[in-house]
Amino acid sequence: MTVHIKVYSDYVCPFCFVGKAAFEEAIKGKDVEVEWMPFELRPSPSPQLDPVNDPSKQYMWQTSIQPMAEKLGVEINFPNVSPHPYTDLAFEGFHFAKEYNKGHEYNTRVFQAFFQEDQNIGDIDILTKLAEEVGLDGASFKSALETRTYQDVQRQALKHAYEEADITAVPTFIIGDTVIPGAAGKDVFEKAISDEQKKK
């Protein structure tokens, strides 16, 4: 039986990127259906993070994020985009991509652009280039972002995450009835999937 999984994450969350890699290893070859769910850690107009000029954030990167990434075999770089962009436009692009069955590919590409290539994922032109790289029509994508076609869709997605699903931190993985908060190892995800399959 197919195990349904929801993954709540934000594109500027390093733990989301690290956890995504381990999660995707765990689900390879398994009968699962994954739904990627938007979550904005700092929606506009909240103050933006500026880790480049914040020694405490750099310390956390060196002592927590980098070691976890190395342990899980994930290539991740400290993003020098300053300050960190809001992710509402990137998520509006995700909703566009989903309509063309490219949500997963787009998701992966945006994470890579921010955490491996230092690209500003709050910039429409950059997001359009990333969309084209995964096979989406650039002109239609750019127009959708400029006219905020998916703004209400994204607002509803956030309302769901904050109020209905009561998500307070990301990443959060909901595997059937099992909730896994934070980045976890491949074995944790595999056990949760196996446990869910045994229930069916």
Swiss-Prot record:
Superkingdom assignment: Bacteria
One MF annotation (Gene Ontology) recorded for this entry: oxidoreductase activity
Signal peptide (UniProt feature, chain positions): none
This protein's name: Uncharacterized protein YwbO
Organism: Bacillus subtilis (strain 168)
